[in-house]
Amino acid sequence: MPAYHPSQTPQAADNGLDDYIGMNQAAKSAAPGFMEKEFMPTLLDAYSIAVKNALSIVLAILLWILTLWIPYINIGTTIALCTMPLALSRNKPISPTFIFDKRYRQFFGEFFLTGGLMLAGVLAGALFCGFPAIVILISWSLAPMLVLDKGCNASEALTLSNKYTYGNKFLIFILFLALLVSLGVLLGIFGFILGAIADALGFIAILLAIILIPATGVGLIAAIYKRLVYQNSSPS
């Protein structure tokens, strides 16, 4: 496996992981309100990513659970799992075993520092009737992926995430609500149809829900990251 070089470009990479780990690409962001015109394309893209990668996402989660007890290995797998939307945002299929790539472990210091700062910020926001916690969570939601994607430290990642989501936080919140409602409706209709055919088929709807709920959630984060980060204007 090739060594990691921060100055390496995606074009010179030898495998898919190099395309989205530590490439130090120039920071880019969308304009405030950008997600308004991208609302439906983002939602549809989330479903597209989820359908294409649902099995890989679920298997990766299962592999993470099965290996969570292994010291040191669990550091890399946890980082890989938490930043999975970064891989999916490049429109490339993923393998469930990608979580075992050793290069994820080299980011553990900045990643967990970023996570700790995010948790502290959300808890502080929760003291003020809860709503600020949601704002902070959305504002900093891209930070863990930015640590890997841009090779920045925790402070820089949080700052960049806030800039990328500026002016789009409310629409991101509505996107998650829309995903939750639409997925609930789709699963409800599917379950009703199966139940009308035979009561025993209801487990298929439950199985589908177990697969699609995490897959669509990860897919939406990937679709949002794709649109907010990979744009032409620099964050200000």
Feature annotation, model-predicted:
Residues 1-45, 94-96, 229-236:
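Low-complexity, intrinsically disordered extramembrane tails and loops of integral membrane proteins
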Residues 22, 64-94, 122-159, 195-233:
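Selective recognition of hydrophobic, aromatic-rich stretches within alpha-helical transmembrane segments
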Residues 31-52, 95-105, 155-166:
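A short amphipathic helical element positioned immediately N-terminal to and/or at the very start
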Residues 48-62, 108, 166-174:
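Membrane-interface helix starts
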Residues 56-57, 107-111, 172, 199, ...:
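Residue-level signature of transmembrane alpha-helical entry/exit and packing/kink sites
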Residues 56-74, 174-187:
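Hydrophobic alpha-helical transmembrane segments of multi-pass membrane transport/permease proteins
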Residues 102-126, 172:
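Alpha-helical membrane-spanning segments of integral membrane proteins, especially the hydrophobic core
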